[in-house]
Design a protein with these regions (language model features):
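Topogenic membrane-insertion module of multi-pass membrane proteins
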Residues: 1-68, 75-89, 100, 113-123, ...
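C-terminal membrane-associated helical module and adjoining short loops/tails
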Residues: 4, 143-310
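Alpha-helical transmembrane spans of integral membrane proteins, capturing the lipid-embedded, hydrophobic core
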Residues: 11, 15-19, 40-48, 89-93, ...
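Alpha-helical transmembrane segments of multipass membrane proteins
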Residues: 20-24, 93-98, 122-126, 149-153, ...
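Short, glycine- and charge-enriched coil/turn segments that flank and shape catalytic ligand pockets
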Residues: 27-31, 105, 159-164
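Transmembrane helix interruption/hinge and helix-loop junction motifs
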Residues: 29, 101, 109-110, 282-289
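Multi-pass membrane catalytic core of lipid/isoprenoid biosynthesis enzymes
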Residues: 40-41, 59-117, 121-124, 142, ...
Length: 310
């Protein structure tokens, strides 16, 4: 139970969702399965590493302000947490490297997952360490989500000299997720205290911008015939309907900035990553995979009633 609290267990399904959705979008399915499974495990390992190291870096502050967290409460020794956090970080980069070299039919091996995994690990440590208390914290958090999505897609693309590493639409989707999360993180800067704050206004605008980027990004694809949903009308409508409740709650938090309203907005905003990711799975691999990713919301919602997601 203490470890589940430390890694913020409900949130892991958002990573399962966006890494899986990126692979499904790029590969139009789960083939090759070995690469799909391995790159998803890499994403989970890196995410859990970030969650654990977050509390390792914050242990002195948590002893004063959040003594109920597993490390200051004595449920998990700081040494154990350090070993687990750094070990998972190395495991995540290692799994990403392996994913690019597993057999994939005629597809060549690729070092792209290793490069993305290593860059993600660096940004995770930068956020957990020196950047968390600075204005760059939301940017770093958004960067983690950008790289998380690109990690999922990276196993599908070889590195070719003179060619872009990723298609433009994939990069724009990743940036859309990053901007969306950057907005949510900005709104969460003072969630425990509440009260009027420019962060709420700015965060709401940035979250809306991220949602718009997600809605229009597939239109940048040069091969839209492979999509299972029209990227010009149906898909933007889907994203709009998914993001709208988050934006409405955000607007309500701006008007009445109580801690409860802000925290509810953040919680809903984080959990909404799953249906957003499911939309891209459906776009690239069909409705069956879209539903499968969407169903990850079930354990997420159940577990979020028992564990904090922020």
């Amino acid at each position: 139970m203490a470890w589940a609290q430390l890694v913020r267990l409900p949130n892991v399904f958002t990573v399962l969702a966006d890494v899986s959705a990126a692979f499904l979008l790029a590969s139009h399915g789960t083939q090759p399965v070995s690469r799909f499974v391995t790159i998803v495990l890499a994403g989970v390992a890196l995410y859990w590493a970030g969650m654990i190291l977050n509390d390792v870096f914050d242990v002195e502050r948590d002893q004063q302000y959040r003594p109920g967290r597993p490390i200051p409460a004595g449920q998990i020794a700081i040494g154990q947490a350090r070993i687990a956090g750094w070990g998972l970080l190395l495991a995540g980069v290692g799994l990403a490297t392996v994913a690019g070299h597993l057999p994939a039919g005629d597809a060549p091996t690729t070092w792209l997952p290793a490069a993305v995994g290593l860059l993600l690990a660096i940004v995770i440590v930068a956020y957990d360490g020196p950047l968390k208390k600075t204005p760059l914290a939301p940017v770093a958090m958004g960067g983690c989500r950008v790289l998380s999505f690109l990690l999922g897609a990276s196993a599908c693309f070889p590195i070719i000299a003179g060619e872009p590493l990723f298609p433009k639409y994939v990069v724009t989707i990743a940036l859309g997720f990053g901007v969306y999360v950057m907005g949510i993180t900005t709104m969460a800067r003072h969630e425990d205290k509440g009260g009027p704050s420019p962060n709420l206004h700015l965060g709401l605008v940035v979250t809306a911008l991220g949602s718009i980027m997600l809605a229009v990004a597939p239109q940048m694809s040069t091969n839209q015939a492979g999509f299972h949903v029209s990227p010009r009308d149906v898909f933007p409508f889907m994203i709009g309907m998914i993001a709208l409740p988050v934006l409405i709650r955000g607007f309500g938090a701006v008007r009445d900035p109580s801690p409860l309203k802000i925290q509810t907005t953040i919680r809903v905003g984080i959990l909404t990553i799953i249906p957003l990711a499911a939309s891209f799975a459906a776009l690239g691999a069909g409705p069956t995979w879209g539903i499968a990713i969407f169903l990850l919301a079930v354990p997420t919602i159940y577990l979020s009633l028992r564990f904090r997601v922020t």
